[in-house]
Amino acid sequence: GPQAIGLREMSKQTRECVECHKKESPGLYQQWGASKHYRGNVGCYECHMANEDDPDAYRHYEVTIATLVTPKDCARCHEKEVEEFTASHHSKGGRILGSLDNVLAEVVEGNRGLVTEGFPEGISPAAVNGCWQCHGSEVKVLADGKMLDPATYPNSGIGRINPDGSEGACNACHSRHSFSKYQA
């Protein structure tokens, strides 16, 4: 497919991202280069920018970013779509995590062998790879404030519970970096 070769109006921050990521993450770079976001001058920084007080924000070279892009981030440009999604049943899929159904599944499964910093007592691998992949996880930020717990992210579950308090994952249907409405 088409490859990103440089936008005339690319922000300074995105230009700096691209200089490194076209070498370090060529697949992501090429997906973005074939996207409507690329053609609309929406780059890495425009989606990943974060405020310093965001729970998952960290300094990356000269900018403050978050690895995780949430519906709150997408709402900067897609306010109507995010309002519709937030009002839908889909965005609430992660709420099953606190339900009796989830507790029962974890008790029946019994295996709490996946131990991470965010789950020192262990968590069920069946929950992580089963339930959470569709319903969404509650994404946990590790103590360093930069890394996300690998048991909870990457996760594209439609009802993911994000560190910024938003629910849902736009990329459950609109895959990351290509953002195709046709894939949805």
Question: What are the residue ranges of the model-derived segments?
Answer:
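Short sequence/structural segments immediately N-terminal
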Residues: 1-184
